[in-house]
């Protein structure tokens, strides 16, 4: 038996009072059945979560969500105390991750929070303090 299986057997013994190979196999089969519930390609999720891991990008998404309207870099700059270049770079990363939308009108580019970002922020807000 592998070390993982031995540890699982110890867990089952604690839970059930006793454990045999059939108990271990049944638990392993049950656990393996959940594999299909995992995303086949988690890259999009991981990109979105890691992109929000920057304070600048997180603040921009929160700001766009709070204002509930499109904003230009020059409007974001007074609130997010970094250079216009850093804001533009952060917005580009957020767009690539699917967390903001953008549109160009004349010389101006406007950004707004995406539905996905709103859902992530809502999940964070709904679970704040649960840790």
At which residue positions do the language-model features occur?
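Beta-hairpin "wing" of winged helix-turn-helix
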Residues: 96-105, 112
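Short, hydrophobic-biased segments on the C-terminal half of alpha helices
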Residues: 91-92
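N-terminal helix-turn-helix DNA-binding core of bacterial DNA-binding proteins
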Residues: 40-82, 110-111
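Conserved segment of winged-helix/HTH DNA-binding domains
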Residues: 113-131
């Amino acid at each position: 038996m592998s070390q993982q299986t031995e540890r699982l057997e110890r867990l089952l013994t604690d839970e059930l009072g006793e454990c045999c190979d059939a108990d271990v196999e049944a638990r392993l089969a049950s656990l393996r059945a959940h594999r299909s519930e995992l995303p086949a390609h988690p890259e999009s999720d991981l990109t979105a979560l890691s992109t929000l891991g920057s304070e600048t990008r997180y603040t921009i998404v929160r700001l766009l969500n709070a204002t509930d309207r499109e904003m230009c870099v020059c409007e974001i700059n007074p609130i997010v105390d970094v250079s216009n270049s850093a804001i533009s770079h952060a917005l580009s990363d957020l767009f690539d991750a699917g967390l903001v939308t953008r549109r160009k009108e004349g010389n101006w580019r406007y950004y707004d929070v995406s539905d996905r970002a709103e859902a992530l922020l809502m999940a964070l807000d709904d679970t704040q303090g649960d840790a």
